[in-house]
Amino acid sequence: MEQEKILIQKKNETEDEILRCALSLFVSKGYFNTSLSEIAQAAQLTKTQEIYDYFESKQQLAATLYNSIIDSLSVSIDEIRRRNKKASEQLHSLVNLLFKLTEEAPNALRFLLTVNATEFLPQEKLFLQTPAVNKMLKMIQLGINNGEIRSLSPMLIYGYFFGIINTTLELILNGTLDKKSELYQSQAWLAAWNAIAKK
């Protein structure tokens, strides 16, 4: 039984390493320019075939990555919504999280913001159709209902608010804004909030 636990743990560690290496390669080279042999080499596997012990294809590997990142974001949003009652507090906490991710998980954020996943994952939901975005829209609707946010379509408000936030994050991630992300965070928050706040 102990041997089985060790094998399962080792399998999970290897799978995580494959995912981590694939993520890094997908955001630096692009999905189509990344081969399974490059992923295997980066993950220090002895043979490319070993990837098939964990994933049926490169596309399934990418889908696992995409869904894992979306699910993690969705869980974080649930926690933010539980801790904060006002929409402004929820959105501010979400912005804090996203800026923190530029330092702690930049490749995951790059994968969400800059990689066009629909090109190679046509069967997956568009980011705007995921539970994570649906929860963001609920934050916005809460703010509209409570009079904090202008009374416009929640998706339009999403576009105004996250247009500013996501563009700032992309500029940080690609090095155009070359200082620490925290130096841009309050300015981005104020610009985004002022674009949607009810005056």
Predicted region positions:
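N-terminal intrinsically disordered/low-complexity leader segments
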Residues: 1-13
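Amphipathic alpha-helical packing segments from all-alpha helical-bundle domains
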Residues: 71-74, 78, 121-146, 155-159, ...
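Hydrophobic core segments within long, regular secondary-structure runs in both alpha-
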Residues: 95, 99, 133, 137, ...
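Hydrophobic alpha-helical connector segments
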Residues: 64, 78-104, 157-161
